[in-house]
């Protein structure tokens, strides 16, 4: 079957939820038996989001093959079964970098390099490569129609209709239809102007998804259809909902998938959304409620921890427990003390970089250890747990990470100088290496200790999880920490790197160097998060032993 392309654009305002809408549509098409993948085209000039501030951009989502990508790829993996790779996300910076590399190499035979055709051709080639082997590929174009940064991408997707055939391309435009309380009606004019802007580029949308805080009346949808030159059945009303996992059913109920399949001449069965119905049931029918404190440094933007927040919710689904997440600034723990941690059913310290707020995270790990509160540390959350244990249990008072104190007496966490990448090739780094793309990245296997809690949770001896870190436990000081009572529950396959630690003198204290949140999904959950949420509920009920 020839690959079909659905291009998803957004208008009127940013942050409309293009990624969620596109992923929900992909979930329906996948439920019809189609082989679906997704792509995100980002208009910023950074090569990738790896060195961008989480407070500006949100989290960096890491794929199995080690790509540092946009957080929307996390949504994609949570909604469809297809695993994302570095092919599924690229930026303006990445495209220009590749075109300039080819120009320096002489690939263009002395031609004058221009946005059209050289940049647009590179974009089209990447879209086609990313969609190879799939029935349908949904391509989300970042930004808002009208932004100057998005123009090369919009021109490229316009040209795709001629490249692969109009019968294999579908343009889906997401807009805002605001409600004005003063007049008591929804206003369609912003949508009309957004489509007009798209038409000026040469793209006629095939369908519109209209975001609003309420159902858009049929007469207003007919008006939008008339002025925007689309069939009425192709104007989809997408109202605000209390759970993003309800959106696939909402789109299906309006026949968007039928309309698209008919357009592509795809003969496939009706979508079976029973798995999503089960997710919605689990979310809506908890048998208890817990409050988990997440102690981090980027808490002013929850999207900086998007996958962790979603993974905690998934853990709640599988444990039939509603999870309330209390975001706590680690600097507040430093200034106000551990009193602000009282009343929590569990504590999670997520990943992060830099010295700011790290002592607050160490205090949180100590509070959880001493008060027998369930603790889950992720990446830096494992490192601070190791530092805390070394200082306060193993009598290594000056213990620290060389990231924060290069000359400390006990560098229990230190820079990894070499490791094997996902292809088995040796990677070497020093303190002077570039920050971008120089970490231990992607899926890595890990052997679990037979007597560990994590072995029981995972139910197997070897697991594969995704990494994103530059520092690791210092093996030269490890024996003293183990002798003080800390258990190494997981190691890399070559036995050189510590991947998971546990405290056997604590009812539920687990910390891992990898990022389990990247592989958690609403349908399957994740054993670490499900176990963590259950431990929080048992702690609340006084049942945690």
Curated annotation (Swiss-Prot):
A Gene Ontology cellular-component term: cytosol
GO biological process, any: pyrimidine nucleobase biosynthetic process
Reactions it catalyzes: UTP + L-glutamine + ATP + H2O = CTP + L-glutamate + ADP + phosphate + 2 H(+); L-glutamine + H2O = L-glutamate + NH4(+); UTP + NH4(+) + ATP = CTP + ADP + phosphate + 2 H(+)
Residues given in the record as Mg(2+) binding sites: 72, 140
Amino acids binding CTP: 14, 147-149, 187-192, 223
Enzyme class, broadest EC rank: ligase
Residues binding ATP, per UniProt: 15-20, 72, 239-241
Pathway: Pyrimidine metabolism; CTP biosynthesis via de novo pathway; CTP from UDP: step 2/2
Molecular-function GO terms, alphabetical: ATP binding; CTP synthase activity; glutaminase activity; identical protein binding; metal ion binding
Residue positions binding UTP: 14, 187-192, 223
Region (Amidoligase domain), start-end ranges: 1-266
Activity regulation remarks: Allosterically activated by GTP, when glutamine is the substrate; GTP has no effect on the reaction when ammonia is the substrate. The allosteric effector GTP functions by stabilizing the protein conformation that binds the tetrahedral intermediate(s) formed during glutamine hydrolysis. Inhibited by the product CTP, via allosteric rather than competitive inhibition.
Protein role: Catalyzes the ATP-dependent amination of UTP to CTP with either L-glutamine or ammonia as the source of nitrogen. Regulates intracellular CTP levels through interactions with the four ribonucleotide triphosphates.
Note: CTPSs have evolved a hybrid strategy for distinguishing between UTP and CTP. The overlapping regions of the product feedback inhibitory and substrate sites recognize a common feature in both compounds, the triphosphate moiety. To differentiate isosteric substrate and product pyrimidine rings, an additional pocket far from the expected kinase/ligase catalytic site, specifically recognizes the cytosine and ribose portions of the product inhibitor.
Family per record: Belongs to the CTP synthase family.
Protein name in the entry: CTP synthase
Organism: Proteus mirabilis (strain HI4320)
Lineage: Bacteria, Pseudomonadati, Pseudomonadota, Gammaproteobacteria, Enterobacterales
